[in-house]
Amino acid sequence: MAEAKNRVCLVVIDGWGISNETKGNAILNAKTPVMDELCVMNSHPIQAHGLHVGLPEGLMGNSEVGHLNIGAGRVVYQDIVRINLAVKNKTLVENKHLKEAAERAIKGNGRMHLCGLVSDGGVHSHIDHLFALITALKQLKVPKLYIQFFGDGRDTSPTSGVGFLQQLIDFVNKEQYGEISTIVGRYYAMDRDKRWERIRVCYDALIGGVGEKTTIDKAIDVIKGRYAKDETDEFLKPIILSDEGRTKDGDTLIFFDYRADRMREITECMGMERYKDLNSNIKHPKNMQVIGMTQYKAEFTFPALFPPESHKNVLAEWLSVNGLTQFHCAETEKYAHVTFFFNGGVEKQFANEERCLVVSPKVATYDLEPPMSSAAVADKVIEQLHMKKHPFVMCNFAPPDMVGHTGVYEAAVKAVEATDIAIGRIYEACKKNDYILMVTADHGNAEKMMAPDGSKHTAHTCNLVPFTCSSMKYKFMDKLPDREMALCDVAPTVLKVMGVPLPSEMTGQPLVNEA
């Protein structure tokens, strides 16, 4: 077994952000002598929100993403951010799976379809992604492109569809490429409740041209006529704009929604055998290829433009590879975070990894029991520290986040104080058993319990979080040369303190210099 230069105990506090605002700040106003000492002694604030953790810019962090980044030692970009960056940097044209789809179309019958929700709602799809795909496919020289327009009206206003259709018409005219072939509401195209009779309406339209026939120059007037009869974007019955734009034998179809749940049924019918459940009279085309924007379901046989990324050699795996044992502990509410998410989004327990689940209190809301099971989690961790069995011990403390979500300020103060007491007990055990204690948080919460208007604030925040190290041999540097410090730097810092070399997959940086 490899030897660790130092043993490390990593504590991840849930929902502990840094803010100088005193009003409604359950962290600043609580008695936290232990965290105060650790922060003054040797610490640095780090970023835990937005692009720093792979989320869209300005979006508050969350527990899942926080633990994923902490454990991975790299920024783990969410699907939407990966797509947005490809669109912004104009690199879609280099996407391996898009190039393969284009080659298939070119070598085959020359026909490609883009199918999806056309709006700027940003929940399931974005019109900018559609524009970028049209541009990329034109650059890749796909001869014929057909666009199947799914009306929104749910994540956007109910009659905004004509505006999005006009934008698409203008874009296609400007590019002199692509043809809008079908318009149908998401009610029929994007069902997720196995209401196959709805999906059949869309299926019959896309393949068989079943619907009201008109031309592109009259399409907006047709939709406005539907609005007058209270048939809004979501519920638009199929409008067929060209016979050529039906899906035919040998066609290639890209569905450009990035959210999976409402794409599963329609793609399973178009790209797999599920169409048999529709009892449609329309003959299913042969040799069609479906591609998703993302992986809609692990069991689906067709490719995705942005498949899930595998996170090889996350901290837990790397310690295991190096023959080092480890211990992960949390109460029920956060157990998945110290196992599945901390381990890179995999359920698998690595070799020499021990886990411990402490049951969360059975109460209606956690403001009724602010300390939650923090004392019991500390007990389990201290037990391990005394055994000196594992060179890496980690745990999560849930109270600041879970009680923070209740919006009850006084309870949040108690939750913060209970967490500080628990960390204090662990700190004493670390000193006695020669462990270096490192403390961080996955995102902010309890430091903002009050909104500007005085009402309860129950959400996460975009504030910085602490990162502390109890050994003065490893002093935090002032800054990184090219970016702000963030959660992705926690695992590399832990490895540096343990004296374990970093895997090449970790792009985070150690934030301490050895004295």
Curated annotation (Swiss-Prot):
Its EC number(s): 5.4.2.12
Q: Which GO terms describe its biological process?
A: glucose catabolic process; glycolytic process
Could you cite one Gene Ontology molecular function of this protein? phosphoglycerate mutase activity
Describe cofactor binding as the record notes it.
Answer: Binds 2 manganese or magnesium ions per subunit. Cobalt and nickel are less efficient.
Listed binding positions for substrate are 124, 154-155, 186, 192, 259-262, 334
Q: Which residues bind Mn(2+) 2?
A: 14, 63, 442-443
Q: Which domain of life is it from?
A: Eukaryota
**Its pathway?**
Carbohydrate degradation; glycolysis; pyruvate from D-glyceraldehyde 3-phosphate: step 3/5
Characterize the regulation of its activity.
Answer: Activity is not affected by 2,3-bisphosphoglycerate.
GO CC annotation, single = cytoplasm
Q: Which Pfam families match?
A: iPGM_N, Metalloenzyme
* Active-site residues, record numbering mapped to chain: 63
Gene3D superfamilies registered for this protein in UniProt: Alkaline Phosphatase, subunit A (3.40.720.10), BPG-independent phosphoglycerate mutase, domain B (3.40.1450.10)
Thermal dependence reads: Optimum temperature is 32 degrees Celsius. Active between 17 and 32 degrees Celsius.
Write down the top EC class of this protein. Answer: isomerase
Which key words are in the record?
Glycolysis, Isomerase, Magnesium, Manganese, Metal-binding
User: Per its UniProt record, what HAMAP family does this chain match?
Assistant: GpmI
Q: What does this protein do?
A: Catalyzes the interconversion of 2-phosphoglycerate and 3-phosphoglycerate.
Family listed: Belongs to the BPG-independent phosphoglycerate mutase family.
Which PANTHER family does this chain map to?
2,3-BISPHOSPHOGLYCERATE-INDEPENDENT PHOSPHOGLYCERATE MUTASE (PTHR31637:SF0)
Q: What is this protein called?
A: 2,3-bisphosphoglycerate-independent phosphoglycerate mutase
Gene encoding the protein:
ipgm-1
